[in-house]
A protein has these predicted regions:
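Short, surface-exposed terminal/edge motifs of secreted or surface/virion proteins that either
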Residues: 28-42, 171, 176-179
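Asp-box/WD-like beta-propeller blade repeats and closely related beta-sheet repeat scaffolds
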Residues: 34-67
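Beta-propeller domains
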Residues: 1, 84-96
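Blade-loop segments of beta-propeller domains
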Residues: 1-20
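Conserved beta-strand positions in repeat-built beta-propeller and related beta-rich domains
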Residues: 23-26, 77-80, 125-127, 168-170
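Surface-exposed loop and turn segments in beta-propeller and other repeat-based domains
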Residues: 45-58, 99-108, 187-207
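Beta-sheet-dominated scaffold domains
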Residues: 10, 111-265
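Solenoidal tandem-repeat scaffolds enriched in leucines and small polar residues
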Residues: 61-83, 107
């Protein structure tokens, strides 16, 4: 189709029939590999696994998702440029079937979806200026609840889980989705005030689509790298954040990175 693939995202899962991996790139259909065969997920497919061809799917699928994750034994896809507010999910325990009759569906986020990430018992749906979460209600259906309409995520690949929280880059700095003592409630406090001016400048002047993030769990660190193949390595910048223990209190410290260009993490 002449479009360029800039990033490939994936999720690994096992719904009881062995390990699978599903890929999404925002240009082509999502594709699933079961260790032997590849199957494209297309909305034009009638649904289910078909050994005679290389496609699967159903009418509830989105055809060129940029985002993929696993939640409650469903494959979730989103980030299709033509339907930016749609969050699609497969039938339960069946990544190849995307028909409503089998239990697949689409959820309208109400805004352009930047990222989807499971955290505890919810699937968080990030927009540029709003955050919602998908959970399973008493009727065993997926329900969409508002988290905040006052803040969102400005960098798709900034959303990382570390230290029991879900970190993301907001317009005013890094914020964690932190669970509180009240069931179902979250906190969204800024944790990067010491470098807020630096972060605001980076957001203003850099392409957030080129941001890549990684968690270094052995060091309780997150590292973000900004820059793509068109950026000289010497001009590539980034942010490093680490959880520290000072006098029995856990907190964040941040610093700047320079000269490391990463195309993926």
């Amino acid at each position: 189709n002449g479009l360029t693939v800039n990033k490939l995202r994936h999720a690994v899962f096992n719904f009881g029939t062995g390990n699978h991996i599903v890929f999404a790139d925002g240009v082509n259909p999502a594709i699933i590999f079961n260790g032997t065969n590849w199957k494209e997920i297309k909305s034009s497919h009638s649904g289910g696994y078909d050994a005679s061809n290389n496609t699967a799917g159903g009418a509830q699928a989105v055809n060129a998702p940029a985002l993929v994750d696993i939640f409650e034994n469903h494959v979730f896809l989103s980030g299709h440029e033509a339907t930016r507010a749609a969050v699609a999910h497969s039938a339960p325990n069946d990544p190849y079937t995307w028909t409503a009759a089998a239990g697949a569906g689409q959820i309208a986020a109400g805004f352009d979806v930047v990222q989807i990430k499971p955290f505890r018992d919810d699937l968080f749906v990030f927009g540029n200026n709003s955050i919602k979460k998908i959970n399973v209600n008493a009727s065993n259906d997926f329900a969409l609840d508002q988290v905040t309409a006052n803040v969102g995520c400005v960098a798709r690949d900034s959303v990382l889980e570390i230290g029991g929280d879900l970190m993301f880059l907001a317009p005013d700095g890094f914020r964690p989705v932190a669970g509180t003592s009240r069931i179902g409630d979250v906190e969204l406090e800024t944790v990067s005030k010491p470098i807020q001016a630096t972060l605001v400048d980076i957001i203003k002047n850099e392409d957030m689509e080129t941001l890549n993030g990684v968690v270094i769990r052995s060091k309780s660190q997150i590292r973000y790298f900004i820059g793509d193949s068109t950026t000289d390595a010497s001009d590539s910048i980034g942010i490093i954040g680490g959880l520290t223990n000072s006098s029995g209190s856990i907190g964040w410290e941040f610093g700047e990175l320079l000269g490391i260009r990463a195309s993926c993490c």
